[in-house]
A protein has these predicted regions:
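Mixed-charge, Lys/Arg-rich low-complexity intrinsically disordered regions
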Residues: 3-30
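Short, compact, well-ordered microdomains
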Residues: 47-82
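Short beta-rich binding modules
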Residues: 10, 39-44, 54-57
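Short polybasic amphipathic segments
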Residues: 18-24, 38, 60-63
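Short linear motifs in intrinsically disordered
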Residues: 25-32, 50-55
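Short coil-to-beta transition motif at edge beta-strands of beta-rich domains
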Residues: 28-43
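Short coil-to-beta-strand transition motifs
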Residues: 2-3, 42-52
Length: 82
């Protein structure tokens, strides 16, 4: 049986100060917590990159082992396991 994913974009949720998963402009996940895993689409390599959401006082929210942090997260194509 293949793994099922929900795919959408990252968006900042000002109600809880977290980045969440938007699908068709609706919150599928209203906010990720530190340590939650997801995949981010790398347009240059044309592949999914596994990562996790974290937060630091210096750079705010960021994706581990990527260059994405802070407002750079807005609009990224991501997927999460169902």
């Amino acid at each position: 049986m293949s793994t099922q994913y929900t795919t959408g974009i990252l968006g900042y949720n000002s109600h809880n100060d977290r980045y969440g998963l938007l699908v068709c402009d609706l919150w599928e996940i209203d906010g990720f917590h530190c340590g939650e895993t997801l995949d981010v689409w790398d347009y240059d390599k044309e592949q999914w990159i596994p990562t996790r959401m974290e937060m630091s006082w210096n750079k705010g929210w960021y994706l581990v082992d990527t260059n994405y942090c802070g407002s750079d997260l807005e609009g990224l194509r991501v997927r999460v396991r169902q």
